């Protein structure tokens, strides 16, 4: 899982190229299949499109072509296909579908949007642009929350399971992972974008988890947003992968991100702290006496968040833990509420 996670990270993190050149590549710049010799098999298509992607500067060329060919053949990954299918000649319909999907990849559409689904914490989630694509490191945030619930059962309501708020639910990846692994838990999930609210609803229904989730179309930066959430307090946990990219870094994002994903879900303001500070200001009003906040952040944020909390002692919040992602960067924060 972590290997594929690193592949996904590369797909979504390469330096931004010249976007104006990309759109013309889709259907007029690859060699035709007629130039290929031998049967047009799955392996042949992977090799062909890998070369095309490499020629056009598409990141992770082989992985992209393998995912697409496997998808057309009804599998999650190329390696999971039966070996007999690797060399079996493809039908004209399959070849046409592969060409269409690879054309989208040439336009730098993320593989997740091309396939229309992606796995997260073992769950198959529908993916629709421009809703934010869950990154592999966010799985580690979920794992940390699960560890905390297991190690500190006294800090959550033992009988009913934890009551959790997710800020910025996107596709529902974090919320639905927690619901699926904490059978007695309940989640209130909020997002300011209607498309994200709709997609979380759909994914919850696909996974039959809709009975334990309340999804609210809400901007937590809006005045009076707390009044919409108070009926569910006191909460045990707040979890979020908020917009945290420094505004000056937005121009360096890959074309896959800039052209297709909702940039509002990424832009965290000048220091990437705009939504983070809103969450930290809101959470104490909703959490129980020893409730916790788990955040995914930029590696520069642990120091900034610690300093900000020290300058706001009235919130009664303390940074009690920092964890690194699989690349060794400080990526996750655990902030805990204490008694006044």
UniProtKB/Swiss-Prot annotation:
* Gene Ontology biological process terms from the UniProt entry: methylation
Kindly state one GO CC term assigned in the UniProt record: mitochondrion
Key words, A-Z: Methyltransferase, Mitochondrion, S-adenosyl-L-methionine, Transferase
Q: Which positions are annotated as binding substrate?
A: 241-244
* Catalytic activities: L-glutaminyl-[peptide chain release factor] + S-adenosyl-L-methionine = N(5)-methyl-L-glutaminyl-[peptide chain release factor] + S-adenosyl-L-homocysteine + H(+)
EC number(s) for this protein? 2.1.1.297
Subcellular location per the Swiss-Prot or TrEMBL entry: Mitochondrion
Top EC class, one word: transferase
Keyword Transferase attributed? yes
In alphabetical order, the GO MF annotations are:
nucleic acid binding; protein methyltransferase activity; protein-(glutamine-N5) methyltransferase activity
> Which InterPro entries does the record cross-reference, listed alphabetically?
DNA_methylase_N6_adenine_CS, HemK-like, N5-glutamine_MTase, PrmC_N, RF_methyltr_PrmC, SAM-dependent_MTases_sf, Small_mtfrase_dom
Signal peptide (from-to): none
Q: In which residues is S-adenosyl-L-methionine bound?
A: 168-172, 191, 241
Q: Which family does it belong to?
A: Belongs to the protein N5-glutamine methyltransferase family.
Task of the protein: N5-glutamine methyltransferase responsible for the methylation of the glutamine residue in the universally conserved GGQ motif of the mitochondrial translation release factor MTRF1L.
Tell me what this protein is called: MTRF1L release factor glutamine methyltransferase
């Amino acid at each position: 899982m972590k290997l594929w996670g690193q592949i996904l990270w590369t797909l979504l993190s390469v330096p931004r190229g010249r976007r104006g050149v990309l759109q013309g590549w889709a259907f007029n710049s690859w060699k035709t299949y007629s130039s290929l010799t031998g049967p047009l098999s799955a392996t042949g298509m992977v090799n062909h499109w890998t070369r095309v992607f490499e020629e056009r500067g598409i990141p992770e060329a082989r992985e992209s072509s393998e995912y697409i060919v496997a998808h057309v053949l009804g599998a999650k990954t190329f390696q999971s296909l039966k070996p007999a299918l690797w060399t079996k000649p493809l039908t004209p319909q399959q070849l046409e579908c592969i060409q269409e999907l690879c054309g989208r990849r040439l336009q730098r559409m993320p593989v997740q949007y091309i396939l229309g689904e992606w796995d997260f914490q073992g769950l198959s989630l529908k993916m629709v642009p421009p809703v934010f694509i869950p990154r592999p490191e966010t799985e580690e945030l979920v794992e940390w929350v699960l560890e905390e619930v297991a190690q500190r059962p006294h800090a959550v309501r033992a009988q009913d399971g934890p009551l959790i708020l997710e800020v910025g639910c996107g596709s529902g990846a974090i919320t639905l992972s927690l619901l699926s692994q904490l059978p007695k838990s309940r989640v209130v999930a909020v997002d300011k974008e209607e498309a994200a609210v709709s997609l979380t609803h759909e994914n919850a229904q696909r996974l039959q988890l809709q009975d334990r989730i309340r999804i609210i179309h809400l901007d937590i930066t809006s005045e009076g947003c707390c009044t919409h959430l108070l009926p569910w307090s006191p909460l045990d946990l707040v979890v979020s992968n908020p917009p945290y990219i420094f505004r000056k870094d937005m121009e360096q994002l890959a074309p896959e991100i800039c052209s297709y994903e909702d940039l509002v879900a990424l832009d965290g303001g000048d220091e990437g702290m705009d939504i983070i500070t809103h969450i930290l200001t809101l959470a104490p009003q909703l959490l129980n006496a020893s409730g916790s906040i788990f955040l995914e952040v930029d590696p520069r944020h642990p120091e900034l968040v610690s300093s900000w909390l020290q300058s706001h002692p009235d919130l009664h919040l303390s940074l009690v833990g920092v964890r690194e992602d699989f690349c060794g960067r400080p990526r996750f924060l655990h902030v805990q509420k204490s008694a006044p």
